[in-house]
């Protein structure tokens, strides 16, 4: 990590320029804090002795004369709108123009690489007396003139060369002005860049002082500005163009009352006395930082005193392709499905209705509206992917730039390299998927480069980073730390805001921070004004972002956005932690040096803190309760932060109360201890770092370390000090030894304990540790089940695990595994197999519908419960219903629940389980769901369970307890309506099939007797059991019994079940005037259907007629089988649709042919020119761009220039060959030289090889061709293509050729033709997938 001030040995030169006379008047050289003899030698100028020259050469090097000279670097300026920064990196060949002999002044104010141009303005002020608002700064980079702001006119850049001032011929008040600026003043926009540019490698700048123009003409100007029109001419035509720091009011004040400027506009004209004082203090502090930087870096980089010195907790990586890429983000969004792994996608694009945001989410997503209200600047798609329960966000812009961001725990200790590696692994599969979309995603060709590609630039930003200083301070020491930052605040290096918390120091670091978005101020102003609220910001803000210097409202917002990076310093027991927020990697390296030089100065040098203020790491003592607990959690949060893994876990401070927590030491600390103290330590483990840790128990009342088992969600053993030492052979001795060896204590370890170790049965209502038992609540044991068991047997509740990674309520899962005597992961594997079924959607009363297939559901079960890679998200409760169904399918086991959430115990049983309980064959498990967790009930004997955990968990018809369960279930189902079992008992009739809906409920029965066609008999939505009656997940059949046959069965049913009598209340008639059924009476009336008949049955003659405009079966059909039965005339409609869009399909084939024909010639010319250019010589480079401009447009020249600047000449040609340019698409102009007939013949010859001719077009599925590309590409299924050729009726081809020729020869049709490259027929029509929910918002 280098930290060097180049301006000390290569000083900044500031030359004052008078535009009125076009002459340079004075040069100021900022020497900074150089040795006294160097300063003296510099100031002698022409009177320097050989000794002086030797001193200067020793300090500045052999080129000292050039560094202290008055050379002007640069020639004529270029049009910044066209050739801004057009030259490659300067190799040393400069156009040096020697200025006339002018006065040179030497300043002792220091310039630093981290100075922004805003800082430079202030330093110019103290050195020259020219206040910031009078400074027009310009300089040269690579022979191109640069300024510190951007002036836009109607969206295009304006050339800003103050040296052209005398070329303006129109005058107002004796000053030359550009009148075009006033005529278009509403289209002007100034973007202030001073705060977003560092001086860095710029060593010579020029300042045009407004006073050189204004002072001689003040009287004339005063008269002119009385007229509003002349004022506008002067302000917009001169002031705003070259001195935009001045608002109209400030300019008027400058002319009329210049001495009032400091009072009225302190930001434009700060107090010179205060500014000098602040800059001298800043110089002192920064010089100290530079002086100590290398020593501190060497001391702390790679320091092993703490568990790592760096932890990135959030970051964004920007990938910038060097090649020009155009992405159709709308199509990427459409073709990319939402899944449980990628549950959310958002796209912003310009649709036929205007700016549009479309979001879609998988039904398992918990934040469906995330990002849909985001402000977008360009067409963009956002994808969110979850890996191992961690969210990664990918943002792709339509120019191929993309951003990857995520968050991490501090304990993961990610550094910059691992962050890049982690995000790369996340992004690669998505990039591959998008690239496989081909021209549908990339209409101009190309693909997204992977982060590992050499043709990209990678930058890390928006980081939050924690770093650690490996010393501790006392409370007084930390107070001293805070007080020492006050100097930095007075120097303007930091800014302290708001109230400070105890043990935390929070401030904003301002100096050298420049990586902001200059447009953020606009967005914040727009948001803050809001609809329906009055905008309280001067309208000038929209035109000039320098408004923060003359408008207090804008200044407050500017400070909020650009006020610096947030830094927090935490006073901890074991070290000092520093958090930095929203920084770049470059800023981290820079801030780290400042912060660690400051901290190291607390313990070294003449200003070090007194020894009694500094705690020694190896001399830890038993602290106060809070500090001791904090120390443990700081050094091993994975062990001591129990709620990190289970939000319901009991915290460590309750499990091990003061003064029993031990003291923890690292290996490095132990090595520095005296041998006697080292012998007192117990070696254990640091779970966060994966290295040994050492513990002591310094409190005299609790001198012995013990390890608590069964408390940590991950089964880690928790250190805690005890009064007595565990005796050999005892249970505690066994547990401690197991923990010290294995670091965990699990169920198997319990089984290995001495079988004689006694464990009492817990009372009901407490949390039950794993493999412990508890009594049932007395109202269940003593009343409900009192006569169902005999001594010595007892009913009990058995403790099982309640949590696992990512799942805070896993008790049911572990209960089922215990009941079935299976390892938990084995259970998950088996039920995952059962979930992979075509009827997966019925599971959990339709909860399976959250997934697109059984395979997806099965994979999600495995990832969640076996691999433990997923959080359950919205599936958090639905999984339990799905698991219960799968266990019933796999093991024919059903569960009943006693739920005790509010102190009142409720019996809960699902309808399907009731059906099973009421049947002869049953296997039932009883589960208690309490506030403390979910546990299985068992029948056992206490001694037997304590010895070998033997117990009965499954109950059948033979167990007396089932009589109680049967009785309670029977009572719950007697609610005044029939169900499947009632219907099965009608004599002479047989139920042949149960019809099941997508929520896994039976909605109707098919019944036969001696008829050929089944009777359709609806029932209330009922659960069902798997018995000898077949089930069918299908629609109501069309071939069913007549009314007479149906009514005969209903009369018999009414006879047997008078309480359920079926009484018709209305006749059902379809649109063909056929009678098809009737509606029964009651709130839950059912629809009875029979075979259609033209004759109204006599039984129903007196009933009202209800017309069915659409048969409910047709609606169900459309939902279940949307593509199987199209509308009667769908083929004709699809064919008409195809013919209406066939010209678009032909156009895209035409352009695809032209792309290949026309770009090759231009590319060959560029490559030849490239080979002839020496990119190390500016003259050769200039000639390259000049010749290039003869046949390539300006946008392509900028693209080529960018490639050369970022890759270097050696690699640039390779990148150029991959890139797509505008000249690839200037296709139509050469064809306009043809006559109409010639062009028709040419087009026919050109396109015939691309056409598959047909006499006529048969059925076409229009739904598959909303997105279309050339038939040459096979990334999409395109029914208009065959054999990679476009299908066209032979009798239509010539007509289309004629239309195309006419359109090409019509210059008004050019833009219309090129728009077909979008390849979308209806941009608001999207693929509808079963598990996706799509919403559309227009953004106006």
Curated annotation (Swiss-Prot):
The keyword Transcription regulation applies. Signal peptide: none annotated. The lineage of its organism: Viruses, Varidnaviria, Bamfordvirae, Nucleocytoviricota, Pokkesviricetes. Belongs to the asfivirus G1340L family. It is found in: Virion. This is Early transcription factor large subunit homolog. Keywords: Transcription, Transcription regulation, Virion. Putative initation factor. It comes from African swine fever virus (isolate Pig/Kenya/KEN-50/1950). It comes from the Viruses. GO terms for cellular component: virion component.
């Amino acid at each position: 990590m280098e930290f060097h001030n180049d301006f000390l040995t290569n000083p900044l030169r500031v030359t004052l320029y008078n535009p009125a006379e076009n002459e340079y008047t004075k040069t100021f050289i900022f020497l900074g804090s150089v040795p006294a003899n160097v300063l003296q030698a510099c100031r002698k100028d022409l009177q320097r002795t050989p000794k002086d020259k030797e001193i200067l050469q020793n300090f500045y090097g052999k080129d000292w004369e050039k560094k202290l000279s008055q050379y002007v670097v640069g020639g004529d300026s270029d049009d910044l709108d066209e050739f801004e920064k057009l030259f490659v990196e300067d190799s040393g060949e400069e156009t040096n123009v020697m200025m006339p002999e002018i006065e040179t002044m030497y300043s002792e104010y220091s310039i630093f690489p981290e100075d922004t141009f805003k800082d430079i303005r202030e330093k110019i002020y103290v050195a020259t007396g020219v206040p910031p608002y009078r400074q027009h700064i310009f300089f040269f980079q690579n022979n191109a003139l640069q300024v510190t702001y951007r002036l836009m006119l109607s969206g295009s850049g304006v050339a800003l060369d103050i040296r052209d001032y005398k070329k303006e011929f129109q005058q107002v008040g004796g000053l030359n002005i550009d009148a075009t600026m006033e005529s278009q003043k509403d289209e002007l926009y100034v973007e202030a860049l001073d705060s977003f540019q560092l001086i860095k490698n710029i060593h010579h700048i020029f300042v045009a002082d407004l006073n050189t123009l204004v002072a001689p003409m003040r009287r004339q100007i005063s008269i002119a500005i009385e007229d509003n029109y002349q004022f506008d001419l002067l302000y917009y035509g001169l002031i705003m163009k070259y001195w935009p720091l001045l608002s109209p009011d400030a300019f008027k004040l400058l002319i009329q009352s210049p001495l009032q400027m400091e009072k009225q506009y302190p930001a434009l004209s700060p107090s010179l006395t205060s500014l000098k004082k602040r800059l001298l203090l800043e110089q002192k502090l920064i010089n100290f930082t530079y002086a100590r930087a290398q020593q501190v870096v060497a001391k702390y980089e790679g320091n092993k005193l703490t568990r790592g010195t760096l932890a990135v907790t959030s970051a964004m990586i920007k990938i910038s392709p060097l090649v020009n890429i155009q992405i159709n983000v709308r199509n990427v969004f459409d073709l990319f499905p939402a899944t449980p792994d990628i549950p959310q996608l958002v796209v912003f694009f310009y649709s036929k209705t205007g700016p549009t945001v479309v979001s879609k989410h998988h039904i398992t997503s918990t934040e469906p509206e995330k990002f849909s209200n985001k402000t977008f600047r360009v067409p963009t798609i956002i994808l969110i992917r979850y890996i191992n329960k961690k969210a990664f966000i990918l943002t792709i812009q339509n120019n191929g730039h993309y951003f990857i961001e995520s968050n991490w725990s501090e304990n993961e200790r990610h550094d910059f390299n691992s962050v890049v590696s982690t995000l790369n692994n996340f992004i690669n599969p998505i990039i591959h998927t998008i690239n496989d979309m081909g021209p549908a995603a990339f209409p101009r060709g190309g693909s997204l480069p992977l982060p590992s590609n050499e043709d990209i630039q990678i930058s890390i930003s928006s980081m939050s980073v924690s770093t650690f200083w490996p010393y501790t301070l006392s409370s007084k020491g930390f107070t001293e730390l805070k007080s020492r930052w006050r100097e930095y605040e007075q120097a303007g290096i930091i800014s302290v805001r708001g109230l400070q918390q105890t043990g935390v120091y929070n401030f904003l670091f301002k100096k050298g921070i420049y990586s902001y978005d200059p447009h953020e101020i606009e967005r914040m102003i727009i948001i803050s004004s809001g609809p329906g609220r009055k905008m309280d910001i001067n309208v000038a803000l929209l035109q000039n972002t320098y408004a923060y210097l003359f408008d207090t409202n804008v200044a407050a917002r500017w400070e909020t956005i650009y006020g610096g990076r947030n830094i927090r310093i935490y006073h901890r027991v074991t070290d000092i932690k520093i958090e930095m927020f929203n920084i770049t990697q470059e800023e981290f390296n820079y801030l780290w040096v400042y912060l660690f030089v400051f901290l190291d100065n607390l313990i070294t040098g003449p200003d070090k803190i007194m020894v009694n203020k500094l705690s020694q790491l190896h001399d830890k003592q038993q602290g106060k309760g809070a500090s001791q607990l904090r120390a443990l959690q700081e050094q091993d949060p994975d062990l001591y932060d129990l709620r990190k893994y289970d939000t319901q876990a009991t915290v460590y401070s309750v499990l091990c109360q003061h003064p029993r927590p031990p003291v923890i030491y690292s290996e490095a600390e132990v090595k520095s201890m005296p041998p006697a103290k080292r012998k007192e330590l117990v070696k254990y483990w640091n779970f966060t770092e994966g290295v040994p840790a050492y513990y002591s128990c310094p409190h005299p009342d609790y001198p012995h370390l013990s390890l608590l088992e069964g408390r940590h969600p991950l089964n880690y053993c928790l250190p805690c000090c005890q009064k007595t030492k565990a005796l050999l052979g005892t249970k505690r001795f066994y547990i401690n030894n197991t923990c010290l060896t294995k670091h965990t204590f699990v169920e198997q370890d319990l089984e290995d304990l001495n079988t004689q170790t006694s464990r009492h049965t817990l009372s009901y209502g407490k949390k039950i540790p794993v493999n412990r038992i508890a009594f049932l609540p007395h109202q269940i044991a003593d009343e409900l089940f009192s006569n169902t068991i005999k001594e010595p047997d007892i009913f009990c509740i058995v403790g099982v695990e309640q949590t696992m990674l990512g799942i805070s309520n896993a008790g049911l899962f572990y209960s089922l595994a215990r009941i079935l005597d299976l390892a938990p992961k084995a259970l998950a594997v088996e039920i995952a197999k059962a979930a992979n079924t075509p009827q997966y959607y019925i599971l959990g009363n339709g909860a399976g519908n959250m997934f697109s297939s059984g395979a997806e559901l099965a994979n999600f079960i495995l990832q969640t419960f076996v691999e433990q890679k997923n959080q359950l998200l919205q599936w958090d409760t639905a999984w339990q219903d799905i698991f219960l169904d799968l266990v019933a399918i796999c093991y024919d086991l059903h569960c009943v629940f006693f739920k005790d959430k509010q102190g009142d115990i409720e019996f809960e049983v699902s309808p399907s389980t009731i059906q099973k309980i009421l049947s002869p064959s049953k296997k039932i498990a009883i589960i208690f769901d309490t506030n403390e967790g979910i546990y299985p009930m068992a029948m056992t004997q206490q001694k037997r369970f304590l010895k070998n955990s033997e117990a009965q968990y499954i109950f059948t018809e033979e167990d007396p307890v089932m009589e109680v369960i049967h009785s309670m279930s029977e009572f719950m189902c007697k609610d005044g309506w029939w169900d499947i079992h009632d219907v099965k008992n009608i004599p002479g009739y047989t139920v042949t099939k149960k019809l099941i809906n997508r929520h896994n409920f039976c909605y109707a029965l098919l019944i036969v007797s001696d008829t050929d066609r089944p009777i359709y008999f609806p029932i209330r939505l009922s659960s069902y059991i798997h018995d000898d009656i077949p089930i069918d997940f299908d629609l109501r059949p069309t071939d069913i019994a007549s009314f007479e046959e149906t009514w005969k069965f209903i009369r018999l049913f009414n006879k047997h079940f008078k309480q359920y009598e079926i009484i018709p209340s209305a006749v059902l008639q379809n649109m063909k005037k056929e009678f098809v059924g009737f509606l029964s009476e009651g709130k839950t009336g059912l629809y009875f259907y029979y075979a259609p008949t033209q004759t109204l049955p006599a039984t129903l003659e007196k009933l009202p007629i209800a017309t069915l405009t659409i048969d409910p079966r047709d609606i169900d059909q459309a939902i279940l089988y949307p593509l199987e039965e199209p509308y009667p005339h769908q083929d004709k409609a699809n064919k008409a649709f195809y013919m209406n869009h066939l010209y678009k399909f032909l156009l895209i084939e035409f352009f695809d042919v032209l792309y290949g024909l026309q770009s090759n010639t231009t590319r060959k010319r560029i490559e030849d020119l490239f080979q002839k250019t020496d990119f190390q010589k500016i003259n050769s480079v200039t000639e390259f761009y000049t010749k290039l401009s003869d046949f390539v447009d300006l946008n392509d020249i900028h693209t080529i220039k960018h490639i050369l600047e970022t890759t270097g000449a050696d690699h640039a040609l390779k990148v150029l060959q991959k890139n797509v340019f505008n000249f690839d698409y200037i296709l139509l102009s050469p064809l306009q030289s043809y006559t109409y007939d010639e062009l028709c013949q040419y087009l026919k010859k050109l396109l015939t090889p691309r056409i598959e001719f047909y006499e006529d077009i048969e059925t076409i599925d229009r739904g598959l061709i909303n997105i279309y590309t050339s038939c040459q590409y096979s990334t999409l299924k395109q029914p208009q293509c065959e054999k990679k050729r476009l299908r066209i009726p032979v009798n239509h081809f010539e007509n289309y050729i004629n239309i195309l020729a006419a359109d090409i020869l019509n210059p008004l049709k050019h833009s219309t033709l090129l728009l077909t490259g979008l390849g979308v027929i209806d941009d608001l029509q999207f693929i509808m997938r079963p598990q996706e929910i799509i919403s559309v918002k227009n953004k106006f």
